[in-house]
């Protein structure tokens, strides 16, 4: 079971899909943190060399002083503190949307982990199934080859028929082809296993199978699928769309901002004559109400767009819920069917073994042809592999129930 432990210890941690999902979640969390900055004062410092054209009439009567200054130039320095006082819920809706987005990113991370766990387990079990099938075909092929050789000798001695020889050879060629086909299936399963687990499987026949409770206790029929991870992701799409619509609604309302500023104006910007070394200082404290009355219907169209997105998210959620519920019911029925079929397959193995022994005894007594012995031995071998693979199918079906319920929680530490 040492390799099975790698599901948590190595495979999930090192998997690229999980790493990417972790970074997406980290990005969403950082975005959420950035949205809170709207609640804090915004501090701005500006320094500039400015020119002004001032055509203000002077109070003096001298003809040369009819204009105070034709032009002004100087250094202007300021520091401004701006604080949002009230924005009709714009900021809170943006933060709530960022929260929902971060939560959805976390669910996507969980889904990535679920997928890689299921990928790892299925690669392991499908490798065992492919190995079982190939070994069974090899056994039948080997038996057919031995039987064919025996029949050829009997035909040479005049003790057997050519028809029986051809029938045996037909079976041999058939299972020779099946062995090559199952070899391709096994090679594909090995490649898949190696790609998933990052090591080459040796001695496949003695590899341990994952324990039945590796993902937890078996769920019950009728269990709600509300914890399905894909469904939870769809639910967050609804929340994100709802928060965006709240923001669009708030755009029709005014906002209130406060501003404190300190400004220094040097040189001619300070005002008056001969002011090269002069300086003017300004302090301002403003409270501003901003209300966009008309913007070319842009906000109205955006609001309609966001409302449509919310309705679409609701429809997608309902569709995912129905689909997931259907998948769980089908998976449960499949699990029950495979479980019931195990008893039938087990009994079939026993029957075929008994019939093979009886046919072999008849053959030794000269009452049955060798073709009958080969046929019963083949039936026994194939029923054995069918029973073995059905046991694996039962495990796969059970793990699929956990996946659909969002309960992929390996108990190994």
Where in the sequence are the language-model features?
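Periplasmic alpha-helical coiled-coil/stalk elements that build and connect Gram-negative outer-membrane
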Residues: 1-2, 115-227, 237, 331-334, ...
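Amphipathic alpha-helical coiled-coil segments
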Residues: 20-35, 112, 116-135, 146, ...
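Outer-membrane beta-barrel domain signature
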Residues: 50, 54-57, 62-63, 177-184, ...
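Long amphipathic alpha-helical coiled-coil segments
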Residues: 190-202, 252, 316, 396-411
